[in-house]
């Protein structure tokens, strides 16, 4: 069963030094823990690699905000990565098996 979580780029379109990907939904830590090389902790900025099938996409800062103390009232994960659109879109793409993309 797919999650009802959504995922979207939270920074302006185009290249920049940093980009933010925001994911909101239920049970995100258990759904997405396979993407990160380190364990996430509530409200802690963790420097970790984002990986898929042992391919590392980027080293990122990842912050987990557990429900209900988040922007949306659900679990929220913020991935602060390099702002290259290819990197950001790759990170979102590996999440598609569990998440639906935010429609812009």
Q: What are these model-derived regions, one by one?
A:
Residues 1-100:
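A glycine-rich (often HGG/GG-containing) alpha/beta subdomain
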């Amino acid at each position: 069963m797919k999650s009802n979580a959504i995922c979207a780029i939270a920074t302006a379109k185009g290249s920049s030094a940093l980009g933010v990907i925001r994911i909101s939904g239920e049970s995100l830590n258990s759904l997405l823990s396979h993407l990160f090389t380190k364990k996430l902790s509530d409200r802690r900025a963790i420097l970790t690699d984002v990986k898929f099938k042992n391919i590392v996409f980027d080293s990122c800062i990842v912050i987990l905000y557990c429900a209900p103390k988040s922007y949306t009232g659900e679990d929220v994960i913020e991935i602060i990565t390099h702002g290259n659109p290819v990197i950001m879109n790759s990170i979102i793409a590996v999440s598609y098996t569990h998440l639906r993309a935010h429609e812009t």
